[in-house]
């Protein structure tokens, strides 16, 4: 890449997501059609697909991939 060229950084993609209270999402992440419970943390490079459910007080760490229709209970560390 030449110094004069620019690039577009990837940000958080959130589409049709039900978010609880006090959620932290670190970019870049891709969340769509899922539910995230209260007091949860989503790290960078995480993808959570449609109909997945993340419980309360969960930590989903970097580079995690949560497939469609997966249910993760409360107080889990992934």
What residue ranges belong to the model's regions?
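Structural signal for interior beta-strand "rungs" in well-ordered beta-sheet cores
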Residues: 6-78
């Amino acid at each position: 890449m030449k110094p004069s060229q620019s690039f577009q950084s990837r940000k958080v993609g959130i589409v049709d997501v039900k978010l609880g209270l006090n959620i932290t999402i670190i970019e870049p992440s891709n969340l769509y059609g899922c539910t995230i419970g209260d007091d949860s943390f989503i790290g960078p490079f995480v993808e959570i697909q449609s109909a997945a459910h993340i419980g309360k007080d969960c930590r989903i760490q970097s580079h995690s991939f949560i497939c469609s229709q997966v249910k993760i209970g409360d107080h889990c560390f992934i």
